């Protein structure tokens, strides 16, 4: 018996088709027509989803790529372009705008309720009074 050589099955191309806007629009309006015959509320829902879809495309491909066009020219693939345009400029500007601060010195806490002997005598005479915040008022 001869062993038959198995040819590798090609990958399904549906994931490529879903990435095309024309194919998405065909599916979108087909599902819209199908479901609006069942329930008219779906018409409003699908139009809302379509507006959100257009807004996402606008912000990802136009706004983000416009602000970092120099990064986009260096990319090969679309996914890498989106990653570089969306994350790297924000990360680099964040690190430049807020550099690591040097460690701050801890302030010594003052003990409340203890006065030096000279201050006690002056307070007894009425020369020094304390307001509600604990600040000294000289009269």
From Swiss-Prot:
Chain ranges passing through the membrane: 13-33, 42-62
GO CC annotation terms, alphabetical: membrane
Bilayer topology: Multi-pass membrane protein
Keywords per UniProt: Membrane, Transmembrane, Transmembrane helix
Bias kind Basic residues: ranges: 104-114
Source organism (scientific name): Saccharomyces cerevisiae (strain ATCC 204508 / S288c)
Subcellular location, record wording: Membrane
The protein, known as: Maintenance of telomere capping protein 7
Region (Disordered): 94-121
Lineage top rank: taxon: Eukaryota
Task of the protein: May be involved in telomere capping.
Gene expressing this chain: MTC7
């Amino acid at each position: 018996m001869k062993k038959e050589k198995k040819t590798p099955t090609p990958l399904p191309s549906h994931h490529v088709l879903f990435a095309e806007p024309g194919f998405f629009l065909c599916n979108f309006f087909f599902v819209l027509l199908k479901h609006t015959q069942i329930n008219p509320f779906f018409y409003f829902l699908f139009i809302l989803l379509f507006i959100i879809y257009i807004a996402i495309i606008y912000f990802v491909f136009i706004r983000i790529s416009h602000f970092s066009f120099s990064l986009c020219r260096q990319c090969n693939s679309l996914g890498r372009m989106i990653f570089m345009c969306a994350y790297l400029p924000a990360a680099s500007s964040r690190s430049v705008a807020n550099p690591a601060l040097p460690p701050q010195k801890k302030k010594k806490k003052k003990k409340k309720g203890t006065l030096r002997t000279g201050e006690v005598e002056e307070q007894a005479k009425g020369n020094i009074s304390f307001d509600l915040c604990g600040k000294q008022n000289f009269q």
